[in-house]
Amino acid sequence: MKLMQFQIDDIIKSALLEDINYVDVTTDYLIDEDDISTAKYVSKDEGILCGIEVALRVFQLLDDGVTCRIFINDGEAVKKGDIIAEFTGHTKALLKGERTALNLSQHMSGVATATNRCVKLVEGTKASIADTRKTLPGLRVLQKYAVTVGGGRNHRYNLSDCAMLKDTHLDAYGSMTNAVNVLRERMGHTVKIEVEVGNLEELQEALDLGVEVIMLDNMSCEDMTKAVEITAGRAKLEASGNVTAETIRKIAETGVDIISLGALTHSVKAFDISMKMS
């Protein structure tokens, strides 16, 4: 996944408006308009870097003359004490953009780091690590980019990407079989269908319907192993629910194709980065 400038500019502008409003009473009253400084991004954590270009864009939207020397790129490992980048430009722009740039890059690096840890935990199995739509409102494009930087895969970006019958849809509509048949009649032929199942009986119904992806929701590892055997490659199997660092390896070893985690985006720990002025 590649970030496009038009995708991130609106996010950054909204964040800057939220933080600066119409004046930075500290910076605007202390710093001369023509004052130039260099700001160093320094890591205080260990993991996978993500969001350095986003941080640069924050400063450039405040001062289009800001330049950057990047020493560590998105997707590369970073450790405590590493100098990640140096930004040079008007001091006012660097100070005003500091918190927004750090908030975004720290969060994105946290997502990438958490994803990478999960990827490493399932190495040697066929399972891929995927995100969900449990993203923070307004930040989905940045979070999903960070997941790919960490070595994970993107699930649906939005509701138009794939038809996904969850328990709430089936509770509201009724029969899984009827729902799948109606969807096939009404939607485009290129759209895939994923169905959420909670037991092996529902799995068999989904397989009989020929859906492309089946989500195994909160199933035991024993039942997931049986589900893999029953499916025998006829559909992609996605494990979801109660996935933790302690359980993810056992889940992967059942033979599922995908393990999806909402925790990669909805509650990730921010990566610690500081900015030093000179």
Model segments located where?
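Active-site loop ensemble at the mouth of alpha/beta enzyme cores that anchors a bound cofactor
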Residues: 274-278
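Short secondary-structure boundary segments
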Residues: 218, 241, 263-264
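Acidic/glycine-rich phosphate/pyrophosphate-binding loops and surrounding catalytic core
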Residues: 2-209, 213, 225-230, 236-238, ...
